[in-house]
Amino acid sequence: MPRDPLAAIYCGVAGYAQFIGHNYEEAVQMARESMRQRGDFVGAHRVLTAAAGMLGDPILASSALEGLRRAQPGVSLAWITRELPMLREEDRARYLEGFRRAGME
């Protein structure tokens, strides 16, 4: 069965939208689907990590952060702040808080 090469990107963006909407479980589901479609899609790893942190699931958050670090070596809060600008400051603060809760420094 042919695959849509953009499905992973769609799911990753949908996961990010769910995160912004405070729907962290849905964000995790969409990020996982994105990663199932394309395991190297770093954006999905980031959404999964931040959403897991906000859910307060230490096992999932630790595993997600480990996967993110494999997919994007050297990723840090400073990199995310610098490279992923967000329109609304409250969204940026919550996104960064998710990474902090997942164990990122």
Where are these regions (language model features)?
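Alpha-helical protein-protein interaction modules
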Residues: 1-105
